Amino acid sequence: MTTSSERPETSVDRKLLEILVCPVTKGPLEFDAARQELISRGAKLAYPIRDGIPIMLPEEARKLG
């Protein structure tokens, strides 16, 4: 059961995910539903999704270990 304080898990449209690529490597992205991020394994960056909009700016991305 979801309470009003919990944010329901959203998903990224499959077609959008097929179109979007990492702006650094031009490689594919993976959707992380728990963190609401698009992951670029090649660039080791996680691009945030805010209000359903992917923020595809390298300076906004979280660096992965």
Swiss-Prot record:
Query: Which pairs of Cys residues are joined through disulfide bonds in the record?
Result: none
GO CC terms on record? cytosol
* PANTHER family cross-referenced by the UniProt entry: PROTEIN PREY, MITOCHONDRIAL, ZGC:162634
Q: Which family does it belong to?
A: Belongs to the UPF0434 family.
Q: What is this protein called?
A: UPF0434 protein RPD_0454
The record lists the organism as: Rhodopseudomonas palustris (strain BisB5)
